[in-house]
Amino acid sequence: MVTKKAKLLHVLNNVYFKKTEPVSIVHFLTNRCNARCSFCFIDFDDPNTFKNELSLDEIDKFTKSLGKSLLNVNLTGGEPFARKDIIEIAKLYIKNTTVQSIYVTTNASLPDRVESFAKAIIDFDKNIELTFQISIDDMPEEHNRVRKMSNLFESCIDTYQRLK
């Protein structure tokens, strides 16, 4: 069994000398999103926008290729919880890499999925550091208007309450 000290030495060697393995990555899981934020860069009118998501098999191969220095992954998108397999994706990172923290950016429109994800990941690995960024741009009325979703602000608060 590899000790924490040995893992840290491997990461430090990679960061300062070899520089061949990532320490942190941002994985853009999907362009799909249930909001239509006025500032978003995703072109929802382009028919190719929602093509080319990586399959679980592709993500499995990808995570196995990342080496043993990965400490953090940021799962983002569109709305990462639009992918029903987000739990399996996170588990692949935990299983196939040395990731210690998972950071998820969400519009918090799907509180049930967010809560299920948090419970499943903590049950899978109690040592993983799990962080959520819930996007709130303004007071309730303006937040909902800009993101073109009614009750989204309230959903953000609901999601936060479930996670705390």
Residue locations for each model-derived region?
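Polar low-complexity intrinsically disordered regions
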Residues: 1-2, 161
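Aromatic side chains
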Residues: 39-41, 143, 153
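Conserved alpha-helical substructure of the radical SAM core
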Residues: 2-130
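Conserved strand-turn element in the central/C-terminal portion of the radical SAM core barrel
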Residues: 104-105, 139, 160-164
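Glycine-rich S-adenosyl-L-methionine
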Residues: 147-164
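Conserved radical SAM core fold
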Residues: 80, 108-112, 133-149
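Residues within well-formed alpha-helices
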Residues: 89, 142, 155-158
